[in-house]
Amino acid sequence: MAKVQFKPRATTEAIFVHCSATKPSQNVGVREIRQWHKEQGWLDVGYHFIIKRDGTVEAGRDELAVGSHAKGYNHNSIGVCLVGGIDDKGKFDANFTPAQMQSLRSLLVTLLAKYEGSVLRAHHDVAPKACPSFDLKRWWEKNELVTSDRG
């Protein structure tokens, strides 16, 4: 099967943080998320990076390609997905591990430096969702992980 060729992103103006909306017991990664996205009719995984429960950062869609993670913003942004984000009852919860949050901070520092002028955004900043399940601005500025009340 031929590898899918995606359009290259002309500019990178934002880095979006998402969650997979999975329970803490579900230690999924790029392979599973790719399968879910393909089952929805997508050509590949929509995120550029996935951060597993143990903090491992996995590459998803090619970093330079247009993603499929934030409608209306895919053409000029990168998508980073944290595995987790809901509790056992399906309610949004900032249940990410310290290893995930450390990896997220490191990755975001790298991406923001690489794509100078880009801004950090949560999926819920541009869509009526609770994703990524926490207050990104508060975490980024104060290192406080608080479940999001947006959605």
Curated annotation (Swiss-Prot):
An individual GO BP term: viral release from host cell by cytolysis
Cellular component, GO annotation: host cell cytoplasm
Cystine pairs: none
Cofactor note: Zn(2+) is required for amidase activity.
Subcellular compartments: Host cytoplasm
Record field: catalytic activity: Hydrolyzes the link between N-acetylmuramoyl residues and L-amino acid residues in certain cell-wall glycopeptides
Subunit structure as annotated in this protein's UniProt entry: Interacts with the viral RNA polymerase.
Similarity comment text for this entry: Belongs to the N-acetylmuramoyl-L-alanine amidase 2 family.
Name of protein: Endolysin
Lineage, uppermost ranks: Viruses, Duplodnaviria, Heunggongvirae, Uroviricota, Caudoviricetes
